[in-house]
Amino acid sequence: MSTTSEIIEKLKTLTLLEAAELVSQIEETFGVDASAPVGGGMVMAVGDAGGAAEEVAEKTTFDVVVEDIPSDKRVAVLKVIRKLTSLGLAEVKAFTNSLPGTLQEGISKEEAETAKTELEAAGAVVKIA
């Protein structure tokens, strides 16, 4: 039996809790986000009688993802999140208890950079996706 087949058979025996734990460990180990969409962003253009040329479409909308908030910086980050969004205090607390999470979606690069700068200044770990 090949290594891949052995791994698949082993995965079939995992409980839902074990599978979720495995996903978390894979995300940590390899620095990936399992919830991030795969692919996209590539556009194929047909050239003149010479074949096909690939070009990468420039991304125009961005998401601000809060990865982590140190416990000693939580209050400062909560204030910044409330300033950046229309969320109430209870919603912001719920959001920060379920990190990582997308705070803003489909915004311009400038808005995303501004939000990232403000959140990082308050102590949050942030990435732009």
Swiss-Prot record:
Forms part of the ribosomal stalk which helps the ribosome interact with GTP-bound translation factors. Is thus essential for accurate translation. The lineage of its organism: Eukaryota, Viridiplantae, Chlorophyta, Ulvophyceae, Oltmannsiellopsidales. One of its GO terms (molecular function) is structural constituent of ribosome. Homodimer. Part of the ribosomal stalk of the 50S ribosomal subunit. Forms a multimeric L10(L12)X complex, where L10 forms an elongated spine to which 2 to 4 L12 dimers bind in a sequential fashion. Binds GTP-bound translation factors. InterPro entries: Ribosomal_bL12 (IPR000206), Ribosomal_bL12_C (IPR013823), Ribosomal_bL12_C/ClpS-like (IPR014719), Ribosomal_bL12_oligo (IPR008932), Ribosomal_bL12_oligo_N_sf (IPR036235). Pfam families: Ribosomal_L12 (PF00542), Ribosomal_L12_N (PF16320). GO terms for cellular component: chloroplast; ribonucleoprotein complex; ribosome. This is Large ribosomal subunit protein bL12c. NCBIfam families: L12 (TIGR00855). GO terms for biological process: translation. The keyword Ribosomal protein applies. PANTHER family: 39S RIBOSOMAL PROTEIN L12 (PTHR45987), LARGE RIBOSOMAL SUBUNIT PROTEIN BL12M (PTHR45987:SF4). Keywords: Chloroplast, Plastid, Ribonucleoprotein, Ribosomal protein. Its main location: plastid. Belongs to the bacterial ribosomal protein bL12 family. It is found in: Plastid, Chloroplast. Transmembrane segments: none annotated. Gene3D superfamilies: 3.30.1390.10, Single helix bin (1.20.5.710). Coiled coil: none annotated.
